[in-house]
Amino acid sequence: MRINPTTSDPAVSIREKNNLGRIAQIIGPVLDVAFPPGKMPNIYNALVVKGRDTLGQEINVTCEVQQLLGNNRVRAVAMSATEGLKRGMDVVDMGNPLSVPVGGATLGRIFNVLGEPVNNLGPVDTLTTSPIHKSAPAFIDLDTTLSIFETGIKVVDLLAPYRRGGKIGLFGGAGVGKTVLIMELINNIAKAHGGVSVFGGVGERTREGNDLYMEMKESGVINELNLADSKVALVYGQMNEPPGARMRVGLTALTMAEYFRDVNEQDVLLFIDNIFRFVQAGSEVSALLGRMPSAVGYQPTLSAEMGSLQERITSTKKGSITSIQAVYVPADDLTDPAPATTFAHLDATTVLSRGLAAKGIYPAVDPLDSTSTMLQPRIVGEEHYETAQQVKQTLQRYKELQDIIAILGLDELSEEDRLTVARARKIERFLSQPFFVAEVFTGSPGKYVGLAETIRGFNLILSGEFDSLPEQAFYLVGNIDEATAKATNLEMESKLKK
């Protein structure tokens, strides 16, 4: 006789509604689960193991089906530690892929790969969830317009502009200002575009993730007193997590970003740090599943895995996801399959320079090494393109002359070269900019500089309009008018000292 599920015990109704299997084998984070004939779960379905270990501690492990082995067995990868599991334990097939909370309630919170909040602020106030596995948007829904994504950061907008709905690689070592640049981008997209950001820490160091969270609270990007005012949702899969969690945490972050784009129709900024660790986790899982390794020991499905993530990051007619991905290059070998596969998807690269950071020029974006496919006259217009090329030529000439200056001094240069060096030094300083998120540390107010203002400023420097002004006037200012005002102040100060 069938018991009415509305009156029956909830545990019984769960068993009725879901297929129940048993653990047949455990090898590290990989579980083989036997199901009754005809009750096999689909690939990517979530499986949940609940019970108690030998010490009586509660166990709640979520896994994801990766392979159907035959003989009514499936192979699944655990999203958390498998300590305490044993053969014969009950496994519930949830009937769907992993689903995570989405929407405005996720802002200001830190989540793990399963979408569970981990920053002790109580449960997430949303009933809306979304599966982490989805198809990329259909061709008919894509917005193929090539448009610039204005960041308000002069060096980025002028020399290596970001594409709306594009993918940007962020290359930078420790201590060159990567975190501050990320936070400023999060702040600016919220103010200028009414957009939000999602940060996916893939294989992050726990300390780095904690530092980022603390700095975001300090700079106002996260407002714990009023979470609705926060501008970012954080999703972390740390280095100590099993490979399954590190492989899927990028998809969790992307799913949250997709909801803001498709349902809220917003422009979204998605940060992935580090995209290499996503590949690395996939490689570990591939080996655990017994697949034959490909070149340099990577998984044979490397391109497909990367493509399934990257193709979902795009502009649609409703909104856009612009992604900034930190890229680690193993042993500085750009031909390594992991970075080589990543490069195929990037529209722009932002390279941070330790030399510029040492000079105190922030953001320390290298103007000559950073590139963008958007810097073409037909996309950005003739004036922008010509200005950017002249700025690069001036800086390149200054770089070539630096050895001569170091050995012989400025006096040995021709009049033309001396002028080039003077303008290049002004340009170098004018590429610096005070950030909103650094106000609490520097005391100087942040500046958002529109693209038209940026182009006007650099054109005036290149034309020789400001050859008479001191180079200090161009350091850490917003637009060119602030530089002229600063020059006047410097002149008055020097007169008063005399």
From Swiss-Prot:
Catalytic activity: ATP + H2O + 4 H(+)(in) = ADP + phosphate + 5 H(+)(out)
The protein's Enzyme Commission number: 7.1.2.2
Catalytic class of the enzyme: translocase
Plastid recorded as keyword: yes
Stored CDD domains: ATP-synt_F1_beta_C (cd18110), ATP-synt_F1_beta_N (cd18115), F1-ATPase_beta_CD (cd01133)
Modified residues (Phosphothreonine): 6
Superkingdom, taxonomy of origin: Eukaryota
Protein localization: Plastid, Chloroplast thylakoid membrane
Keywords attached to this entry: ATP synthesis, ATP-binding, CF(1), Chloroplast, Hydrogen ion transport, Ion transport, Membrane, Nucleotide-binding, Phosphoprotein, Plastid, Thylakoid, Translocase, Transport
Listed InterPro entries: AAA+_ATPase (IPR003593), ATP-synt_VA_C (IPR055190), ATP_synth_F1_bsu (IPR005722), ATPase_a/bsu_AS (IPR020003), ATPase_alpha/beta_chains (IPR050053), ATPase_F1/V1/A1_a/bsu_N (IPR004100), ATPase_F1/V1/A1_a/bsu_N_sf (IPR036121), ATPase_F1/V1/A1_a/bsu_nucl-bd (IPR000194)
Molecular function GO labels: ATP binding; ATP hydrolysis activity; proton-transporting ATP synthase activity, rotational mechanism
PTM annotation (Phosphoserine): residues: 13
Family recorded in the similarity comment: Belongs to the ATPase alpha/beta chains family.
Assembly, per entry: F-type ATPases have 2 components, CF(1) - the catalytic core - and CF(0) - the membrane proton channel. CF(1) has five subunits: alpha(3), beta(3), gamma(1), delta(1), epsilon(1). CF(0) has four main subunits: a(1), b(1), b'(1) and c(9-12).
Protein name according to UniProt: ATP synthase subunit beta, chloroplastic
Taxonomic source organism: Brassica napus (Rape)
Species classification: Eukaryota, Viridiplantae, Streptophyta, Embryophyta, Tracheophyta
